[in-house]
Design a protein with these regions (language model features):
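Hydrophobic, aromatic-rich transmembrane alpha-helices
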Residues: 2-7, 24-28, 42-58, 168-180, ...
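Alpha-helical transmembrane segments of multi-pass inner-membrane proteins
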Residues: 3, 8, 79-83, 104, ...
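Membrane-interfacial loop-to-transmembrane alpha-helix junctions, especially the N-terminal start
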Residues: 15-21, 59-74, 119-127, 186-190, ...
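Loop-to-helix entry and N-terminal half of a specific, functionally important transmembrane alpha helix
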Residues: 19-27, 69, 193-194, 446-450, ...
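Interfacial transmembrane-helix termini
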Residues: 26-45, 58-65, 76-102, 112-122, ...
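Membrane-embedded alpha-helical segments of multi-pass membrane proteins
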Residues: 36-55, 96-108, 161-170, 211-218, ...
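Transmembrane alpha-helices of multi-pass inner-membrane enzymes
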Residues: 44-50, 217, 470, 485-494, ...
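Long extracytoplasmic/lumenal interhelical loops at the membrane interface
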Residues: 319-343, 379, 385-415, 419-459
Length: 535
């Protein structure tokens, strides 16, 4: 197999410089796939850096790349947080280990001869390939096991963390082909792959990825609308696209929210005590759960419905659905309520066979058969919020649980606003908040699922502001903001961190630092490509 020249070790290149390049490829390759390989790669990087020696020269190089120091100083902030941690063993080790790359990756990138731009672009291509391959693997597994949940379409890491990489790859592949002056066919192919990945993302309905995707679209349109070098026509077109996009977003929110918050007068019970077969209805008047405005637990003739269901379905009325999830019965009640049907034989007879198959697959509302997955996910989020408002219990609802944790985290932050509860004190802080709220949720030892709140409760306002200033100084001093991929990565992270504490995990931290190192340290001082190399 013939490798392009820029992938081979160059004559004027040391072994350690080549190892650095290969390890960056490895990081990009394993970002969406293997936490172990990310750790192993970074260990090899550090061992090679130590073995290279020349520490005096490296100190000089670090002094010439002061932007790297700003990133490196993030780590000592969290080390300092150890000194006021309530429980020194409460995630302290994991909290620090996952932040070590803040210290090591910028240090190594600043003190070594950088790869040329052809190599840096190749690293980014490897990232796109890895993300695309992971999506293909997820789809293949779904064809083998159709009962798998949509979150399992990310087979190797959490869908929350893979989702941000997926959004990045969607836009990065287009930037790479345009920046490399690729052929017209290559550009068409890049748009095709980007489109396929976009469809995959929309079909998954992953809320964090959807929010990041919409945020990037908004950022790009704003950028075009206010870019000085653009023509008036182009800026006007971007403005029109912004208005259209905002209109579509509002339409999607209205369409999915209306059935959830629509509450018509409750149906009359008197005079409707019996089914057509003469069986008495049962009503849970204390349970006002609704589907499309209709009460779920009113007008139930359970024995009659059980008999009718078991005659038409191979799934037991009191058993599990196709996905193996308990309580198929509640899904039947919800679906029939969404259609405005009473829960009896007559109501079940009104359902088509395809609707029974949908119920067996866990579909709780007939509207979910008409909508694409991303609208379904938005509708589910509204429904969770409504149920949380109605009962005050977040159990079983992912978004409601996040809201409960955000409230608890804010309560904990209000108790210790300046320095927080310490680097390892996140569980202690959140438990305090949940107990103070007298939360009905029994789960404890959780994180707030919000990066901003996580920093506020662990290192306080002072630590949070310090980290924010250090990252801002890195961005401005390094000139990373001039590179579109870096800015897209920041938009993705900043939006996604509202719903997940991403930088408390290795994969998103490495994702952030890889792009920060490439565009904030290596790209500007990278040698100009040699003749025949990729851009």
């Amino acid at each position: 197999m013939h490798l392009p020249g820029y992938l081979k070790k160059q004559a004027d290149e040391s072994v350690h410089e080549y190892i650095f390049f290969v390890c960056l490829i490895s990081l990009a390759l394993f970002l969406p796939g293997s936490r172990f390989m990310q750790s192993f790669t970074q260990i090899i990087l550090f061992v090679s850096w130590i073995a290279d020696g020349n520490f005096r020269q490296k100190c000089i190089m670090l002094g010439q790349n002061r932007q790297a120091v700003f990133l490196m100083l993030v780590f000592p902030v969290f080390v300092a947080g150890m000194f006021w941690t309530y429980n020194a063993l409460d995630r302290l080790w994991l909290s620090l280990v996952d932040k070590v790359p803040f210290l090591t990756l910028p240090l190594m990138a600043a003190t070594i001869k950088p790869p040329n731009k052809a190599r840096l672009h190749f690293i980014l291509w490897v990232f796109v390939f890895s993300v695309s391959s992971t999506a293909a693997t997820g789809l293949l597994l779904h064809t083998i096991r159709p009962e798998m949940e949509l979150r399992e379409l990310s087979p190797f890491i959490s869908h929350l963390r893979y989702g941000i990489m997926l959004v990045m790859a969607i836009f990065l592949i287009i930037w790479l082909t345009h920046s490399s002056k690729a052929s017209h066919k290559s550009k068409i192919f890049s748009y095709f792959v980007s489109g396929v990945l976009s469809v995959f993302m929309l079909l998954t309905g992953w809320l964090t990825a959807l929010v990041s995707f919409v945020s990037v679209i908004g950022f790009l349109l704003l950028r075009e609308a206010f870019r000085k070098h653009n023509t008036s026509a182009r800026r006007a077109l971007a403005g029109m696209a912004m208005v259209l996009s905002a209109g579509l977003a509002v339409w999607g929110l209205v369409v999915t929210a209306r059935p959830v918050f629509y509450e018509p007068p409750l149906p009359h019970v008197q005079g409707n005590e019996l089914t057509r077969e003469g069986n008495a209805y049962w009503h849970d008047f204390q349970n006002l759960r609704r589907e499309n405005g209709n009460p779920v637990y009113w007008f139930i003739a359970e024995d009659e419905l059980r008999e009718a269901w078991n005659q038409r379905s191979t799934f037991c009325f009191d058993g599990k659905d196709f996905r193996g999830i308990e309580n198929l019965k509640s899904t039947i009640f919800r679906y029939m309520a969404s259609r405005g049907l009473r829960k009896d034989r007559e109501g079940l007879d009104a359902l088509q066979d395809y609707e029974l198959r949908a119920i067996e697959n866990g579909v709780p509302n007939y509207l979910h058969l008409q909508w694409p997955q991303f609208l379904i996910r938005i509708h589910q989020s509204f429904w969770e919020i409504q149920e949380y408002r109605r009962t005050g219990d977040p159990e079983g609802f992912s978004l409601a649980q996040r809201i409960e944790l955000w409230r608890a985290a804010w309560k904990a932050f209000s108790e210790k606003p300046l320095l927080g509860w310490g680097t390892g004190g996140v569980h202690t802080a959140v438990n305090f908040g949940l107990d103070s709220m007298e939360s009905r949720w029994e789960m404890r030892d959780l994180k707030p699922h919000n990066q901003y709140l996580l920093y506020l409760i662990t290192i306080g306002t002072i630590g949070f502001a310090t980290v924010a200033v250090l990252i801002f100084m890195f961005i401005t001093k390094s000139g990373a903001y001039r590179h579109l991929p870096f800015m897209l990565m920041m938009v993705i992270l900043l939006s996604a961190m509202a719903g997940e504490d991403l930088l408390d995990f290795q994969e998103p931290t490495t994702f952030f630092l890889l792009f920060a190192v490439i565009f904030g340290i290596l790209y500007e001082k990278s040698p100009i490509k040699e003749k025949g190399e990729l851009s």
